[in-house]
Design a protein with these regions (language model features):
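Mobile beta-alpha loop/short-helix "lid" or hinge segments that flank ligand
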Residues: 1-12, 64, 96-116
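N-terminal beta1-alpha1-beta2 submodule of the flavodoxin-like/Rossmannoid cofactor-binding fold
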Residues: 1-43, 49-59, 119-147
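Short glycine-rich anion-binding loops that position phosphate/pyrophosphate groups of nucleotides
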Residues: 45-47, 79-80
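A glycine- and small-aliphatic-rich helix-loop capping segment at beta-alpha/alpha-beta transitions
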Residues: 56-64, 91-95
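Short, glycine-/small-residue-rich phosphate/pyrophosphate-handling segment
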Residues: 70-109, 123-124
Length: 147
């Protein structure tokens, strides 16, 4: 498993710069997506939308198809989260990510479900997260054998 923590290092998306001579950070990000068997996105919702750095990163992959047919799970964990979750699901549809219902989880009122160390303390939430991860692994396995 690789955790990508470099969203803030990616330059703002510019379609005029979207060729093979992109910044090293973009090339590396795209390669990590290509090399991954699957992707798990976990994000808050900001102002009823997708955080800008996440949307920017995804925009860099639109014309190069890194997410196309890639098993991609989405967890939105926020105070509400509904609007950002739906917006990101639409973006995943546009980029043709493989995102079935079993790979989607909305965790509203997240602050009531984690402790001071951000460890999940709510048993139902923990169970839902574990089920989503299991479903992602199953989807990857099916994807690998061409089912």
């Amino acid at each position: 498993m690789i955790i990508f923590n470099g969203l803030s290092a990616l330059p703002p998306f510019n379609p005029d710069d979207n060729d093979e001579n992109v910044a090293k950070e973009i090339a590396d990000f795209r390669q990590q997506i290509r090399d991954a068997d699957g992707v798990l996105i976990c994000t808050p919702e900001y102002a009823h939308g997708v955080p800008g750095t996440l949307k920017n990163a995804i925009d860099w992959t639109v014309s190069t198809n890194e997410f196309s047919k890639k098993p991609t799970a989405l967890i939105t964990a926020s105070t509400d989260g509904r609007f950002g979750h739906q917006a990101l699901l639409e973006t995943l549809r546009v980029i043709e990510a493989e995102n079935i219902d079993e790979l989607q989880l909305l965790i509203s009122f997240i602050k009531t479900k984690v402790d001071d160390n951000n460890t999940i303390k709510d048993p139902a939430t923990l169970n839902n997260v574990l089920r989503l991860v299991e479903n992602l692994i199953l989807t990857i396995d099916k994807h690998d054998v061409g089912v």
